[in-house]
């Protein structure tokens, strides 16, 4: 699909078996993350895949304050927090093109629901502490202005923006078809969104950094962006870097 030009950025996800004595509730309790989610009172929802899951996401999806809506696509991860790693993330051609593709996609998506859409911050780098040591992640911020009646149309607005571009790719529709062919797992709640709306403002996050439990045991779902410029070893190391739990005991 990439070589034919059906997609020029495809976010491919994999499932990694995990062995641990901790329950999903323990993982939720001790994980450090801006956004955390535990499904169900006992981490299970009856009738929905029969699974329990926990998410400790560093990536906002959209936030709304007043009428201002912002989205923060995260693209680019390096398993180190050294100056050398930062320079690589800032200058690598593949990482730069990947960011540009997703920022353009999300700018177009946001323009379907908001006016005055602009890129406020482009490719800012943030450290993330993990149980394996720090990693660096690259994000951008895109903002616009919602209509006065956005609260009564919140569901419609979110549906127009989904699925999140940072976990699918571009062009979105063709890439989603390619993902369905390529992946040998069911994503389920992984790469969806979750959040909180208090009647005035909205906070939401992309369901990444995600562990799931079923009758076979526990798995960690992770992934990354693939392009025609991808180098196999670098993509593998990025996927490994994302299999972590940001614990705080």
Question: Where in the sequence are the language-model features?
Answer:
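Extended alpha-helical targeting/anchoring segments
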Residues: 1-249
């Amino acid at each position: 699909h990439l070589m034919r030009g059906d997609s020029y950025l495809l976010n491919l996800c994999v499932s990694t078996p995990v062995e641990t004595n901790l329950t999903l509730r323990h993982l939720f309790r001790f994980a450090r993350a801006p956004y955390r989610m535990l499904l169900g009172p006992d981490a299970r929802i009856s009738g929905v895949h029969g699974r329990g899951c926990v998410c400790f996401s560093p990536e906002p999806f959209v936030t709304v304050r007043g009428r201002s809506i912002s989205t923060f696509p995260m693209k680019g991860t390096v398993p180190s927090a050294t100056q050398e790693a930062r320079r690589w993330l800032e200058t690598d051609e593949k990482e730069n093109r990947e960011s540009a593709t997703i920022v353009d996609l999300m700018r177009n998506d946001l323009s379907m629901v908001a006016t005055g859409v602009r890129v406020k911050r482009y490719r800012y780098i943030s450290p993330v502490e993990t149980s394996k040591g720090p990693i660096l992640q690259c994000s951008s911020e895109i903002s616009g202005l919602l209509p006065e009646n956005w609260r009564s149309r919140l569901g419609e607005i979110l549906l127009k923006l989904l699925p999140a571009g940072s976990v699918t790719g571009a062009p979105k529709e063709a890439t989603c078809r390619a993902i369905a062919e390529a992946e040998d797992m069911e994503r389920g709640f992984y790469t969806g969104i979750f959040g909180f709306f208090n009647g005035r403002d909205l906070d939401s996050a992309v369901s990444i950094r995600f562990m799931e439990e079923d009758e076979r045991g526990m798995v960690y779902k992770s992934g990354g962006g693939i392009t025609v410029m991808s180098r196999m070893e670098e993509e593998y190391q990025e996927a490994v870097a994302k299999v972590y739990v940001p614990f705080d005991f």
